[in-house]
C-alpha cells in the first residue's frame, strides 16, 4: 500500500512538473494579488517559458542549469546558466493594472557554437480558470469579418491552436486572447511582429498556454544573443467586458507611443489624404491645403500616401505606379524640385497640422537605386533571384543603421511628423531562404534578428526625430502585436475598403468596431468605399481616427456637421466600450447593431446604432452597460435634438428602445448623467 501511495505521489509531482503550476485564483480576489502570486509561482517552479536543449526536453535539462533570481520592486530577472550558455527572463509587474509582461533572452558567451536550442516557447505556463472559455478574433484578411471575435469552450474542445501567417503578426490570426468564465479571467497578448503560434490546452480548471515562434532550431554562434516574443497576461475580475475595458486602459497606459509633448497618444487623427497619386507635387499640395482652409474644413493632418518618390517623369506623373518605384527613396524631381517637401511641412506646422508621409522600406523592386547600390542587403526568392520584389534584410545591422539614417533624414528635411510604414510583402519565405544560407541549425535566426532590428529601426527614427509618431499599416492591420503597438498607431486598420466592388459600409463598420473591443486607438478606413456621400458611411468608419480623400471634402453642410460630431465623440473613445448588438459573417449586412462608449468618471458617452440596408428590424431595445444604476441620464439624438430621460437601472435592465424609420439609417445618441 505504501508503494502504491508513493507511486501516486510521484505521478502527481511529474504531471505538475510537465504542465507547470497554476496559482489558484478566486472570483473575488484582487487581480493584483493574483498576478503577483502567479508570477512568483512560475519563477519558483521554472514554468514561465520552456525550450529544448541539446536534444533534451525542457523538463529533462532545466534542473541542471544554475539558477539565480534578482528582484527589485515589481521587477525580476531570472537567469539560468549552463556552461557558456545563459538564458534569462526579464519580468515586470504593473501593480495598478494587474498585468505581467516578460521577454526571454539567450546568449552564448563561449568561443564555439552552442548546443542546439529548439522549440522555444516564450510562455509555457498554466493559469487556473474554472469552466474556461477562450476568446480571440480573426486576423486581418481584408474581409468584413476582420477582427471578428470567436470563442472556444475549452471544456469541450480541450485544445485549440492559432497561428499567424506569412511573417506578419496579425495576418490570419490575432495576437490577443482572453480566457474567462464570467466571474474572472485573464487577457493576454503577444509582442512579436513576425510569425507566432499559440496552443491552449485545458484539463479541469487549468489552462496551459504555450506560445512562441513557429519554428526555432538554433545553435548560437560565439558571442551571439537572441530574444523571444514578449508575452503579457493581465488578470481581472468581473465579466468579459470588464476584462476588455481593463485591457483597453492597459493599452493606453503601457502599449501606446507618446506624442510630441511626451504624453501617451489618446487619439488618432482626422486626416485628409492624397492617395497613390504621384502627380501631386509641392505646388499642388500647397494649393490643396489652401482649398481646405477656404471651405473651412476641420482636420488634423495632411496624408500623402504612396507615389511621391522615384523615377517618374512627364506623362507618367499621374499613373500611380507606386509599386514599381519602391526602393527609389527620393522625391520625384519634377514634382519636388527642391528634393524635399520642406515648404509643405513648414506650412502645415505653422497651421498646427500634422504631416503624414508613406514609406515601404522593407520591400524593393529589383533594379531600383537601393538594390543596385547594396545588393548584399536584399533577400531574393530562392528559386528566382531576380524576382520583381526583394526583401530588405533588416537582420543585417549595417543595413538597419543605413535605413535609419536614410529615412530619418527624409523625415527631418521635410518636417514630417507622422512616419507611415507599410509592409505589403510576406517576408516568411525570404527569412527561410536566409536561414538556409546560414547553414545547419539556424532555423528561425533570420526572423529573430530581423524583428529585433525592426524595433531598433523604428526606435532609431524617433531618436533621430524627437516627437515623431509612427503609423503601422502592413496591408492594413497586419502588424498589430503588442511590441508594434508600443511604437505605432494603426491609421489604416484593414485593406478591406480598398476593394470597392465587394466592400460595404457595414463590413467596414463591423471590422472597425470589433477591433475597438481590443485596441482603443486606431483609424477606420473607408476612403474607397464608393464615396463619403452619406451619414451612414461616415459613422460606419468613425473610430478614433478617420481618413477622407480630397474629393470627399465636397460634402456641403453635412460634411461639417459630421466632422463636428466626430470630434465630439472622439473624446469618449478611450473610455469603456461595449458591443451591445451586432451580426457576424453573413448577418453583418442584415442585422441591426449598437455600440456604446462611456466615460464613467465624466458620466458621458454615446451610442451608435445602425440598421443596415438589408435589415428588416424596425425597432429594438438595447441594454446599456457600465452606468450608475441610481443616477438619471439624459439621452439626446444628435441629428434631431430629441431628448429622453431614464434612470441607469432602466437603461441597463429594460434597455433603450430605438426605432428605425427606414433601413440604411444610423443614429448617434449622446448619453449624459444629470
What are the residue ranges of the model-derived segments?
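Polysaccharide-binding surfaces and accessory modules of carbohydrate-active proteins
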Residues: 28-205, 214-216, 632-640
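Short Pro-Gly-centered flexible turn/kink motifs
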Residues: 218-237, 664-672
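Sec-dependent signal peptide cleavage junction
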Residues: 17-29
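Active-site and adjacent substrate-binding regions of carbohydrate-active enzymes
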Residues: 104-106, 348-350, 398-482, 489-490, ...
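Aromatic-lined carbohydrate-binding/catalytic grooves of carbohydrate-active enzymes
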Residues: 267-405, 418, 428, 435
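Active-site-proximal substrate-binding groove within the catalytic cores of carbohydrate-active enzymes
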Residues: 453-644, 658-660, 665-667
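Positively charged n-region of N-terminal signal peptides that target proteins for export
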Residues: 1-7
Amino acid at each position: 500500500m505504501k508503494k502504491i501511495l508513493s507511486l501516486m505521489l510521484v505521478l502527481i509531482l511529474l504531471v505538475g512538473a510537465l504542465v507547470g503550476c497554476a496559482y489558484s485564483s478566486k472570483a473575488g480576489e484582487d487581480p493584483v494579488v493574483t498576478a503577483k502570486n502567479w508570477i512568483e509561482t512560475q519563477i519558483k517552479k521554472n514554468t514561465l517559458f520552456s525550450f529544448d536543449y541539446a536534444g533534451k526536453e525542457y523538463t529533462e535539462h532545466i534542473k541542471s542549469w544554475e539558477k539565480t533570481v534578482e528582484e527589485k520592486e515589481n521587477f525580476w530577472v531570472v537567469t539560468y546558466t549552463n556552461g557558456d550558455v545563459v538564458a534569462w527572463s526579464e519580468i515586470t509587474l504593473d501593480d495598478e493594472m494587474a498585468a505581467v509582461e516578460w521577454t526571454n533572452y539567450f546568449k552564448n558567451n563561449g568561443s564555439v557554437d552552442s548546443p542546439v536550442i529548439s522549440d522555444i516557447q516564450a510562455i509555457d505556463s498554466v493559469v487556473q480558470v474554472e469552466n474556461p472559455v477562450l476568446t480571440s478574433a480573426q486576423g486581418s484578411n481584408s474581409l468584413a469579418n476582420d477582427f471578428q471575435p470567436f470563442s472556444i469552450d475549452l471544456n469541450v474542445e480541450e485544445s485549440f491552436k492559432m497561428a499567424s501567417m506569412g511573417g506578419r503578426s496579425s495576418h490570419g490570426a490575432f495576437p490577443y486572447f482572453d480566457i474567462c468564465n464570467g466571474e474572472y479571467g485573464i487577457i493576454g497578448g503577444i509582442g512579436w511582429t513576425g510569425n507566432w503560434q499559440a496552443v491552449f490546452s485545458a484539463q479541469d480548471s487549468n489552462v496551459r498556454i504555450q506560445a512562441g515562434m513557429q519554428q526555432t532550431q538554433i545553435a548560437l554562434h560565439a558571442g551571439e544573443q537572441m530574444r523571444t516574443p514578449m508575452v503579457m497576461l493581465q488578470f481581472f475580475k468581473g465579466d468579459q467586458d470588464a476584462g476588455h475595458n481593463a485591457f483597453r486602459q492597459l493599452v493606453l497606459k503601457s502599449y501606446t507611443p507618446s506624442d510630441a509633448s511626451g504624453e501617451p497618444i489618446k487619439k488618432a487623427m482626422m486626416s485628409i489624404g492624397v492617395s497613390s497619386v504621384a502627380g501631386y507635387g509641392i505646388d499642388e499640395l500647397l494649393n490643396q491645403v489652401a482649398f481646405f482652409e477656404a471651405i473651412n474644413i476641420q482636420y488634423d493632418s495632411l496624408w500623402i500616401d504612396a507615389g511621391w518618390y522615384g523615377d517618374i517623369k512627364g506623362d507618367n506623373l499621374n499613373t500611380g505606379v507606386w509599386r514599381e518605384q519602391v526602393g527609389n527613396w527620393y522625391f520625384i524631381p519634377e514634382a519636388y524640385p527642391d528634393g524635399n517637401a520642406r515648404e509643405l511641412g513648414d506650412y502645415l506646422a505653422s497651421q498646427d497640422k500634422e504631416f503624414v508621409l508613406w514609406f515601404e522600406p522593407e520591400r524593393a523592386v529589383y533594379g531600383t537605386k537601393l538594390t543596385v547600390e547594396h545588393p548584399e542587403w536584399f533577400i531574393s526568392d530562392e528559386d528566382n533571384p531576380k524576382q520583381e520584389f526583394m526583401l530588405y534584410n533588416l537582420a543585417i545591422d549595417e543595413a538597419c543603421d543605413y535605413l535609419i539614417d536614410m529615412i530619418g533624414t527624409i523625415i527631418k528635411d521635410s518636417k514630417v511628423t507622422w512616419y507611415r510604414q507599410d509592409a505589403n510583402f510576406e517576408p516568411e519565405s525570404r527569412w527561410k531562404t536566409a536561414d538556409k544560407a546560414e547553414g545547419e541549425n539556424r532555423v528561425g535566426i533570420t526572423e529573430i534578428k530581423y524583428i529585433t532590428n525592426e524595433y531598433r529601426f523604428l526606435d532609431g527614427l524617433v531618436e533621430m526625430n524627437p516627437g515623431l509618431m509612427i503609423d503601422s499599416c502592413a496591408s492594413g492591420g497586419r502588424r498589430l502585436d503588442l511590441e508594434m503597438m508600443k511604437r505605432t498607431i494603426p491609421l489604416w486598420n484593414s485593406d478591406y475598403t480598398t476593394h470597392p466592388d465587394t466592400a460595404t459600409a457595414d463590413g467596414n463598420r463591423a471590422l472597425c468596431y470589433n477591433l475597438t473591443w481590443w485596441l482603443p486607438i486606431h483609424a477606420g478606413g473607408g476612403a474607397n468605399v464608393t464615396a463619403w456621400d452619406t451619414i451612414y458611411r461616415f459613422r460606419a468608419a468613425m473610430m478614433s481616427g478617420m481618413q477622407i480623400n480630397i474629393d470627399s471634402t465636397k460634402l456641403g453642410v453635412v460634411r461639417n456637421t459630421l466632422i463636428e460630431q466626430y470630434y465630439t465623440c472622439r473624446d469618449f473613445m478611450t473610455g469603456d466600450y461595449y458591443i451591445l448588438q451586432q451580426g457576424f459573417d453573413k448577418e453583418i449586412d442584415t442585422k441591426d447593431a449598437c455600440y456604446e462608449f462611456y466615460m464613467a468618471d465624466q458620466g458621458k458617452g454615446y451610442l451608435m446604432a445602425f440598421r443596415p440596408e438589408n435589415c428588416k428590424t424596425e425597432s429594438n431595445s438595447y441594454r446599456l452597460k457600465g452606468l450608475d444604476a441610481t443616477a438619471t441620464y439624459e439621452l439626446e439624438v444628435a441629428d434631431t435634438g430629441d431628448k429622453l430621460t431614464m434612470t441607469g437601472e432602466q437603461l441597463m435592465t429594460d434597455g433603450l428602445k430605438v426605432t428605425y424609420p427606414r433601413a440604411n439609417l444610423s443614429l448617434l445618441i449622446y448619453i449624459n448623467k444629470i
